[in-house]
Structure formats: C-alpha cells, structure tokens
Design a protein with these regions (language model features):
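Signature of extracytoplasmic/envelope-associated structural regions
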Residues: 1-325
Length: 325
C-alpha cells in the first residue's frame, strides 16, 4: 500500500551516480489575492502541500537494478527460480491489475552520517517509478551500458528513519561488449551483412502519472500529500543508430511498413542476463546523420501492441531475490 513503509528486511542498499539527496519541498500560500485587508499586500501564511520533485537514480546497468526498475515501472512481475532468480516482467493492464492503475510502491531511505548526530536520516514512504531510460553506447567500460530511473514520492516521510541499512550489495554490471542478441525488425546487427554496424541505442519507459491530490489524500506536518500515483498514457520509446551500408534495409522496412520482433540481450554469465523482447516493432523515422565521420541512420522505432503477445517482455536473471514481491 502507498502509505506502508518498507521493513528493514526488504531494504536494498545500493550506490547512485546522482549525488544529490531527494529534497522535500513544502509549499506555503498567502492571502495576497484576497480583498478586504485595506491594501494589496499579504498578511498571513498558510500551509499548502508538499511539492515533491522527481528524483533520478542513475546507475551502471546491472542485473539487479534492471530487474528493480523494470518491475516497479511496469507492475506485472513473475519471479521464479532459487538463486539465481528469473523475473518475467510485462506492463500491467488496468483491467486485470489488482490495484487498478496503480503500480507497486516502495520506500526510499537516505542518510548522511547516521547515528546520534545525523545530518540526514529519513525514509520517504509511498514512492513509485515514473519511468526509466536504458542507454547503450559505442564506448568501453561500464559507462557503455547505463540505466536511470525517475522516481516520485507522495510527501509522506519518517524522520529519523528507524532503519539500520544493510551492507551495500555488489552489483553485477553489464557493458556493451556483453550484448549477445541484437535483432531489430528482422535485421541482425551481431552477425551476417549487418554485423558490426550497430552504434548506440536508447530505450525508455514513461508512466505519465496523474496528479495524486484528492479529498482524503492525506497530510504530513499540516501539508497535503499525494495519495496515489496512477499511470496515464504510457509511452515506450526506442531509438538506435546504425552505420549505413550498401543494401541497408532500414529504409525499405520504413516505407513498406514492415514490422517484426526486436530482441536485445546482454549476458554477463549464467546468473546475470537481461533480455528486452519487443513483440512488434516498426520504424517511424530513419534519419541520415554522421557519427565520428561515418554516415549513419538514426532509427526511431514504433512499438505496437500485439493482441496475443502484448507489447514488450523483460526477462531478467539475477541473484537478487524478492523484487516487487
């Protein structure tokens, strides 16, 4: 439930490339617009609401974080196995989702010098994943595979948090060299004539949450807080860049309205893998460009909902148990 804090046993401690804490922003209002005071100036302040900004978790893509971000942003999660664990994740549908248009919620603990003289020690309750972005780049190292998740929260919090954080977990991270399957709309970019032509990719998910203020939504410190995050018109976007060569079929697929599956897989080892299977992809835009002096095409995919298989299926194997369960 949105107002239920996580227990310490379910808290996962991890690193974040975003060094800023998640800010709390209480909003006050005044009586400036009211007449009858004898002047135009404000005379009183009133508590209004917590206007909590979105917060970005930015990380090198690991099996653990990908499983977490996909699970909490899409909502329909099935876990199987016993170390490693396999998560099969698809977008929840309002007609069958037990919580309607709401996704699973989590708590966020942030601490600076915890203990008797803590600078910051609080737990934000009722957080949700607004969206994520997966970026694959033509570069070496961990930065070649990045994932960020944009999170929102209601304004409810507990301070001090009452949480003793566990030891930091060791992530099992991917890089672009670990891509083991890369076929978009019938074009295999790992083997055959299109091998070695793939440059980069960005995939993103956006839940477009509706405002969560309503009668009875709740209050903290006398300020109104949000009481739900319901998804709006969700958006799934994929863009990728490939080198142009003689006989490239991307333009033909665009003009002929050709659709097909798209499979993207990263494999670190038997215990850590990530697969994004788009059930029906077409090409919306194919734009000529230049990448490091090489002629390239930037392809904007359009992901279509298939009546049998849905839109996208994420299959993730990771040692981390109990995500979104």
């Amino acid at each position: 439930a949105i107002g239920t804090a996580n227990l310490v046993a379910t808290i996962w401690r991890h690193t974040n490339l975003n060094t800023k804490p998640w800010a709390k922003v209480p909003v006050n209002e005044d009586d400036r617009a009211e007449i009858g005071k004898g002047h135009e100036f404000p005379t009183q302040l009133f508590k209004s609401h917590y206007n909590m900004p979105a917060y970005e978790l930015s990380k090198y893509a690991s099996s653990e974080f990908l499983a977490w971000a996909m699970s909490f942003s899409m909502g329909n999660v099935v876990m199987s196995g016993s170390g490693p664990y396999t998560y099969i994740i698809v977008p929840a549908l309002g007609a069958t989702n037990p919580t309607g248009l709401e996704l699973p919620y989590f708590s966020f603990v942030q601490q600076i010098r915890p203990g008797g003289s803590a600078v910051l020690d609080e737990m934000l309750v009722g957080c949700a994943v607004k969206g994520w972005k997966l970026s694959i780049k033509n570069s070496p190292g961990r930065a070649s595979a990045m994932c960020s998740a944009e999170c929102v929260t209601t304004g409810q919090y507990t301070s001090p948090s009452g949480i003793t954080l566990p030891a930091i977990s060791t992530p099992h991270e991917f890089n672009a060299g670990m891509i083991s399957a890369l076929t978009f709309n019938g074009i295999n970019y790992l083997s055959g004539g299109s091998a070695k032509q793939f440059v980069s990719m960005e995939a993103s998910w956006e839940n477009n949450f509706r405002p969560g203020f309503f009668p009875g939504s709740g209050a903290q410190d006398g300020y109104q807080i949000q009481g739900r995050f319901e998804w709006g018109d969700r958006a799934f976007a994929v863009q990728f860049v490939v080198r142009v060569q003689a006989g490239s079929t991307e333009y033909a697929n665009l003009i002929n309205l050709t659709t097909g599956t798209a499979t993207f897989t990263m494999t670190r080892d038997a215990n850590n893998s990530f697969t994004m299977l788009i059930q029906k992809m077409g090409f919306n835009v194919a734009e000529l460009g230049n990448t490091d002096g090489i002629v390239t095409l930037q392809i904007t995919g359009v992901q279509l909902y298939d009546p049998t298989n849905g839109m996208v299926t994420m299959t993730i194997t990771t040692p981390l148990q109990g995500i979104c369960q």
